[in-house]
Every structure is written in structure tokens, then in C-alpha cells.
Amino acid sequence: MANHLLIGLGGTGGKVLREFRKKVYEEFRSNEPTNGTCINYLYVDSSEDDLNSREGWKVMGKYVHLKEAQKVSIHGLDMNKFQNLSLYPGIKCFLNSGDIDLMTSKLGPLVTAGIGGQRRRLGRTLFANNLASRDGSDFMSRLKQAVQAMQSQTNDQQVTFHICAGLAGGTGSGSVVDTIAQIRQEYRPQPGGTQYKVYLYLYVPEINVANASHDSGFYQANGYAALSELNAMSVGAYYPYDVTGTMDNVTGQVRRLCEGFEPFDAAFLYSNVDEAGKTLNLAKALPASVADFIFQKTVLSAGTGKMARLDGCENDGAG
């Protein structure tokens, strides 16, 4: 029995999880697939409204919203922490003096509100702040709980992680690198590469911004910066700090992660324009299309046809 953990980062990732849940219910009349596939979910967001909203989570007369244990709120950041950063090495390690000045003098309302606000550095800070809590509702605690639940249910240690995020905003774009790094630190690739796989499904900002109100000046720049970091990770040129603040015993500094192994197995990039040139609605049609693709990869049999060729390319490059 296959285990798959779908992780949604920010609003875009949350929409993909929503549409995936609806697809599962449409096919099986149940929140869980009944064909031997085990699916679990983790939705990470800085917006409490989005995390708790049930709007759009209804299909065929039934709500398919996530359980509380499948949500991670990275909302909220105490401004006083910037005055005592030495106590929070997981945050201090990646902030420079300019970042600190910007957050304390100009981004105060965003920081106090605890939202990404289309600022990648703020999104990363919120994610690191969440990891510092270790109160059972933080990302790593919820991640381990989700993985252990699947492994116990299926008696199978193999887990595939599917990370969904948009690269234009602050939360998804700012947290995707550290999400990958933390997963890989806890679930490292095993010999043969079959036990823990990590796939990325990333929305690349549209060339012509669909809604001008969505762009506060960093929309496309965020996408470029995130892709640059992910590319550097994939070729071994960039090893992210461990934002939990764990120190390296040799250097005495916050350790770096993902050295010596592949951070992820494949990254699927998509925009709001399909191969036929048709523009898809960002709120529903686009996340539904991505959810359909993931559904094909995870729930339906990939033994034949185009999906088998795709799996072949991912596993050994043979196609």
C-alpha cells in the first residue's frame, strides 16, 4: 500500500489540497481512497482565515475540509524577538541587519499581523518562528505525526512527499526551501532512492499579472528568487540553514542542511496558461488541474500509459 503526504504551503498550496480532497470524494464517495492508496495532508499557512475557511471545501453536498491535526498555523510573530535574536538562532542565522531594520521599522503591521504579505523573507521568518515553538502543533511535530499515522496504518515505511506552493507570495515562496530541507533532514534518501521521495508542484508567477491587486511590487521577483534558490539547492551550490537553530558541533554555528544528498526528486512548474494557450482561473480551475495531475500520480494506477512513462523518467530517466 502506497503512502503519500500532500503538503500545501500558503494560499496556492491550500487551494490544491482543497481541489484534491474534492476529487477524491467525487471518485470514491469518501474522504479516503478505497483502492489501497493511503493519503494524508498538511496545510501550512500564515492566514488564520484561509486555514479555517470552509468556503469551496464542499462537493456533492459534503464538506471535505481538513482536520485540525492536518493544519499548521505559522501566524503571529512577537516583535520583541527582534530585540533578542540571540535567543532564536534559527531566525537570526538568515537575517542580516537590513532585514531586521526593514521588519522593525517598515513592516511592523505585517509582522504584527503575522502574515507573509508577499515578502519572502517575512514568510521564512514566520516558518522559522513556528519551528522554534515545538509545542506539538508546529510543522515538524505535525509532519512526524502524519507520517507515523500512515506508516502504522499501512505497515509500510515508504512515504512520498508532495509539496504544493505558489512562488509569487510571501508564505509559500518564503517557506518552500526550508520545508524541503526539514523533510530531508528527518527523512533522508535511502539506498536505491525508493523509500522517501520528494516532489514539488510550483506555481510560477504569470507573465502578465492576472489581477493587478495581487502584485504589491514583489510578485514576479519572488518567483525568480525562489527558483534561483531551488536550482542552487538541486545542484549542490546552496545548503539552507537549519531554521530550527540546531548548531553544528564542529563550527559552533547553525548547521547547514541537505549536504551530500538530493534535496528533491523532481519539480513540476506550471503557470496559469496551458499548452493550448488557454488561461485558467487562479482561484479554482488552475488548482483543480494541478490536483487532477497529482491524483493521477498518486491514487490511480501508474502502471500503463503516459503516467508510467513519467514515473520511468523520474525513477531512472528511461521514460
Locations of the language-model features?
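Terminal, contiguous helix-loop blocks that mediate binding/assembly
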Residues: 4-8, 12-22, 26-160, 167, ...
